[in-house]
From Swiss-Prot:
This is Phosphoglycerate kinase. GO terms for biological process: gluconeogenesis; glycolytic process. Monomer. HAMAP family: Phosphoglyc_kinase. It comes from the Bacteria.
Amino acid sequence: MDRLTVRDLSPEEKKVLVRVDFNVPIKDGKILDDIRIRSAMPTINYLLQKRAAVILMSHLGRPRGSGFEEKYSLQPVVEVLEGYLGHHVPLAPDCIGEVARQAVAQLSPGRVLILENLRFHRGEEHPEEDPAFAAELSSYGDFYVNDAFGTSHRKHTSVYTVPQAFPGRCAAGLLMEKELEFLGTHLLISPKRPFTAILGGAKVSSKIGVIEALLSQVDNLLLAGGMGYTFLKALGKSVGNSLVEESGIELATRVLQIAKQRNVRIVLPVDAKVAKTCDSGVSWSEVSINQGIPADLEGLDIGTQTIQEFCKIIDASATVFWNGPVGVYEVPPFDQGSMAIANCLARHPSATTVVGGGDAAAVIALAGCSSQVSHVSTGGGASLEFLEKGFLPGTEVLSPTRG
């Protein structure tokens, strides 16, 4: 890794400003999934062991950017964090201003402070509108640490502008380091082969960049979900009422041509679970893609033969990357394909298996397999952009390693 990590710093008795990603799902004031909080704990605990004063900053949701909104407060996060740390964690009522400055000034070594939601200020998402916002955040710390991989593809103030005020003193956190190790070293730089990528989700256009990048890396590319039907239609198959991105058909044709030139095997569904709607309890059946999906039905999941074929390829692979569900996993039985892939990855411990955040990470969690794959990324969009470009705005501004 060519950037400093938190282990390269000397944070003893110093204030360390840490950008974390605590953008967790909350309902009725309760956190539904705290994986992002748990994922940040190694960095937080490391700094506390070093007797640093740790100042955490994060966004949550999409507030208007015009001041405090209770439903977007980080208070529920504080309660979970206190449980993991075993001691009180103060929440500054704002991330800038006199109350924030006082909270930072009073913070002792070996303790943690959380600043209130960064997005209560427009300056977080629009750095050009409020340079003073970045300047004040930058004034809080002696060092800066970015452990928010999931937001590092955005040029927001806290991940892109603030670290530039810490030349030689801004570093990757332990979670960020792990993300870059798996997505960079294990997937882009030196993947074990055969290398298989599985891409699902709705649109070809939203993933065309990463698809084209992966065509330079992988041996097998398995395509399903909504984008799978777009590829099938590009090949002249009858896909009925299935989700098809008409504007993506030309892109799909181009991808198929590039794959052929680069000797990459593209594998598409050979059968599908179909129904008139994706409502729970709806009557469904399986049909062969060669026979065609009837005009009044839509493909909602990969079929039994496709599951077997996909799993056979996964079992024979040494590296596997998965992003995007292959069916409507929220509605049984159209979750069977995605669940089968999750379980297939979990029973393949000899391979490097990386799940690219987002819905695929949700499927892995539902299947109870998160701990049985090599790495579950905390960033959906960030992981795809990193695979496409090989860097993120938030990682490029971290201090390079010395020498």
